[in-house]
């Protein structure tokens, strides 16, 4: 039984959690419905990935901010026209089942790359600062990576278990559930670019939340070479979209962040909106130091080495982008001979540009590509330029039959001996 179907128990639970956590009952109520909608969509749609600010609070426990939107996408395997087509009717069915209303249903379309479903719920607790509408956004424009499995739960569910009411939590189906979620590292990268984009578009309203989220994420995310590689890969993906201004080749992200700090363009919105959504206080002057850390780290500076070694491999059809052959790279030899170890190309070096039907490799300086077909060396020790020419000159079928999907590629860069990695199934 759903808790909101029992009005008395629901009211009592919301009030108890509100007192226990010192949070507005209107926030507790909305969080319940946000979690419920998320859970049901996750149960019904295969390949779903949860991302954005709500994933940071609900799954990663990285921020102390109430986030009211549900940001969803599909993984690369399920990002098909057929799967996109079922998303809208599934969300409609779920809302009808839960007694919720989609206010803008006529403005949504099946198979569209972006939809925002504005979902209203039966309101018991009013608060002028809380919009009683859940925004469930489905975005199928950019590939979502990396991802991991986390648990999600409502504030009511967490409070019930923490206070020994496990039986009641189970009775009202308020137990945690597993969901695929975008990693904190990727979300941090997205938020830095988004903060710059909204400033350039002069659209600061309700977007100062990114400043707070960046500040909190920096407590959990390590700014290292892997993170820098991720920044580069995301930038390559974003720059093909016209509204992603800060990802364009001529954009200087550190300079844009410096402008955010110096102009204080987000300060008013932070004071009026973001601060009111925090469970724990964090003033603007404290949060803005996160941008200074990003600037000082150099993670978003243009990387000449990566720029020089980025190559695009055209693919004949969109379908072939979803699955491709196994590529490997190895370190440039110092003695003229290639070593006994090669590296399966980690996800951080490979991205997929669906709009241009291309596989994109971002290779660090002094690396070369080694291409194999599962039986013998097809070509070894190609330079980046030679590799691009070699692949472009041959049909994909020339490289054997083993298919490795992007989600299956190694992301840790662990070494594999030549004689074992290529023939294993």
Question: What is each of the regions a protein language model found here?
Answer:
Residues 46-50, 322-324:
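Short, motif-level signal for alpha-helix interfacial/capping segments enriched in acidic residues
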Residues 53:
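Active-site glycine-centered loops adjacent to acidic/histidine catalytic or metal-binding residues
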Residues 1-48, 58-64, 75-307:
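Structured mid-to-C-terminal alpha-helical surface segments
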Residues 307-417:
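Feature detects long, helix-prone N-terminal segments enriched in hydrophobes
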């Amino acid at each position: 039984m759903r808790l909101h179907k029992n009005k008395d128990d629901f009211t009592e639970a919301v009030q108890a959690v509100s007192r226990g956590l010192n949070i507005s009952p209107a926030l507790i109520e909305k969080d319940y419905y946000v979690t419920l909608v998320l859970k049901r969509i996750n149960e019904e749609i295969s390949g779903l990935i949860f991302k954005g600010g709500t994933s940071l609070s609900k799954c990663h426990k990285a921020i102390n901010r109430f986030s009211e939107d549900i940001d969803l996408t599909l993984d690369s395997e399920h990002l098909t026209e057929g799967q996109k087509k079922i998303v809208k009717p599934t969300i409609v069915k779920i809302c009808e089942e839960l007694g919720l209303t989609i206010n803008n249903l006529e403005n949504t379309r099946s198979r569209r790359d972006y939809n925002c479903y504005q979902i209203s719920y039966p309101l018991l607790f009013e608060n002028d600062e809380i919009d009683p509408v859940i925004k469930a956004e489905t975005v199928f424009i950019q590939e979502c990576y990396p991802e991991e499995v986390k648990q999600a739960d409502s504030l009511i569910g967490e409070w019930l278990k923490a206070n020994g009411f496990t039986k009641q939590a189970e009775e009202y189906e308020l137990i945690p559930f597993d969901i695929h979620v975008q990693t904190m590292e990727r979300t941090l990268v997205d938020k830095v670019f988004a903060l710059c984009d909204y400033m350039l578009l002069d659209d600061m309203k309700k977007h100062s939340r990114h400043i707070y989220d960046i500040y909190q994420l920096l407590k959990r995310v390590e700014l290292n070479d892997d993170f820098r590689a991720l920044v580069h890969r995301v930038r390559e993906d974003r720059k093909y979209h016209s509204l992603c201004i800060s990802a364009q080749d001529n954009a200087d992200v550190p300079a844009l962040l410096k402008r955010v700090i110096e102009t204080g363009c987000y300060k008013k919105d932070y004071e009026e909106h973001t601060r009111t959504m925090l469970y724990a206080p964090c003033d603007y002057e404290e949060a803005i130091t996160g941008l200074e850390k990003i600037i000082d780290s150099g993670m978003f500076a243009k990387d000449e080495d990566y720029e020089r070694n980025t190559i695009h491999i055209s693919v004949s059809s969109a379908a072939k982008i979803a699955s491709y052959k196994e590529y490997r790279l190895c370190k440039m030899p110092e003695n003229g001979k290639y070593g006994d170890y090669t590296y399966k190309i980690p996800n951080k070096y490979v991205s997929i540009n669906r709009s241009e039907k291309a596989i994109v490799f971002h290779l660090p300086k002094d690396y070369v590509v080694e291409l194999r077909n599962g039986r013998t060396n097809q070509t070894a020790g190609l330079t980046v330029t030679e590799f691009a020419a070699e692949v472009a000159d041959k049909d994909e079928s020339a490289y054997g039959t083993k298919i490795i999907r992007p989600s299956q590629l190694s992301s840790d860069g662990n070494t594999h001996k030549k004689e074992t990695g290529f023939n294993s199934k």
